[in-house]
Amino acid sequence: MKEERHYIFNHGQLLLRNNGQTYEIPRKPISAIKNLHLFGEHDNLLLYTSESCANEVELPQGYEWIGLRESFNLLPRPIYIEAGKASEILYFDTHHQYCGICGAHMEWHTPISKRCEVCGEEIWPQLNTAIIVLVHRGDEALLVKAKSFRRNFYGLLAGFVE
């Protein structure tokens, strides 16, 4: 039987286990979950994503809810990329329950696509191509700080390609 890795979200927060030196993704759910999806396999691990059922979940010692963006500095890069994909799959499922053609219920067809039970319309998560521009002068880079940033973050200039 293959081992599992569970990317569990609650209001945009990712459940992480702090083992004292590093953070890791839980190997099994620690509370009631909903919208469980198998979204891949990596290093002989089955990758699942789901949402926590409760608004306020009392966590066992060593577990924390951490924002996906904040987890960037806490998780190894491959795990962070998997967490991003897990979040995308949940978003896709939440926002594509019904067919845009006939209004019937959509069912999962593949790990990353849904198909209408009535008309056969198949959809995949939308790709939004973005461009990031580095504005620099010598060794200095132009960064921006938006009022909407909750913490002391600076970002590059970015925009979407139409």
Residues covered by each model-derived region:
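Short, basic and Ser/Thr-rich N-terminal targeting/leader segments
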Residues: A32-I33, D43, D93, G100, ...
